[in-house]
Regions:
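Basic/aromatic DNA-contact patch characteristic of tyrosine site-specific recombinases
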Residues: 1-57, 63-70, 74
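Intrinsic-disorder/low-complexity loop/linker signature
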Residues: 9, 19, 35-36, 107, ...
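Intrinsically disordered, low-complexity segments enriched in proline/serine/threonine
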Residues: 27, 31, 141, 165, ...
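N-terminal core-binding DNA-recognition domain of tyrosine recombinases/integrases
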Residues: 43-61, 69-156, 190, 210
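DNA breakage-rejoining catalytic core of tyrosine-based enzymes
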Residues: 135, 149-189
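Basic, Lys/Arg- and aromatic-enriched nucleic-acid-binding interface segment
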Residues: 175-213, 217
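A short, basic/aromatic helix-end/turn motif that makes direct DNA contacts
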Residues: 219-221
Length: 221
């Protein structure tokens, strides 16, 4: 299947671990092949991220990584490719398909930041696989990129010894950052006027402290 062709029916499944298994967190994503066999390398990487002390990630992060790998391994199954034998070209074709076709789940185009997040997750997985001896070489490489002092660097961009130079993943695409527009004072007053306690207090805390949306929603007052 080329990057311009439509995907067929989804063949890889993702299930969530049930309660009662001490070694596997509840809700942990488990990828199953078309033959309903656990995709072992994906399971091994995710379980390591979820359970190793000092390196464990939040459950939501593991869920996101699982969804990214689900899409990648489903693409591999549909094209008949072994995950260990892919090259940069196959990952690029998968990336290009996301850039040119809408999500099969939301029916909306993928944001470029979403595409990059998925590519980076897959590259993290392959970096881990090489470190564990599953593969000999990485199916991607880095290029030197000059960035401004205020530009956000990706998780897979390594700082070079030269000022303003980073090694960027060749498979990621340029993102056009859209900065949020802050509310004016009069707009804030109108918002506060429609909020009762404790929600007004929560809004004031969020404005004063810069709380993230998830942190704000988790407040108990």
């Amino acid at each position: 299947m080329s990057d311009g062709e439509q995907r067929g029916q989804i063949v890889v499944r993702i299930i969530r671990a049930a309660m009662g298994y001490a070694a596997i967190p509840t809700g942990f994503p488990i990828l199953l092949s078309e033959r309903m066999a656990i995709i072992e390398p994906a399971f091994a990487w995710l379980i390591e991220l979820a359970t190793i002390p000092g390196r464990s990630h939040a459950a939501e992060t593991i869920r996101t990584y699982g969804e990214h790998l689900h899409d990648w391994f489903d693409s591999l199954e549909q094209t008949g490719l072994d995950w260990r034998g892919v090259s940069e070209a196959e990952i690029a074709a998968w990336r290009n398909r996301m850039l040119s076709q809408p999500s099969p789940h939301t029916k909306r185009p993928y944001a470029r930041s979403t595409v990059n997040d998925r590519v980076r997750t897959v590259c993290r997985f392959y970096a881990w696989a090489q470190d564990r001896g599953w593969i000999e070489s990485l199916p991607f490489h880095f290029v030197d990129v000059r960035v401004g002092s205020g530009r956000r660097q990706s998780f897979l961009a390594h700082v070079d010894g030269r000022p303003g130079i980073v090694a960027a993943n060749i498979l990621t695409v340029a993102e056009h950052e859209r900065l949020p527009r802050p509310l004016r004072v009069d707009q804030l007053r109108r918002v506060y006027a429609h909020l009762e306690m404790p929600y007004r207090l929560m809004a004031e805390w969020g404005l004063a402290t810069g709380l993230r949306r998830k942190e704000l929603c988790g407040l108990a007052v």
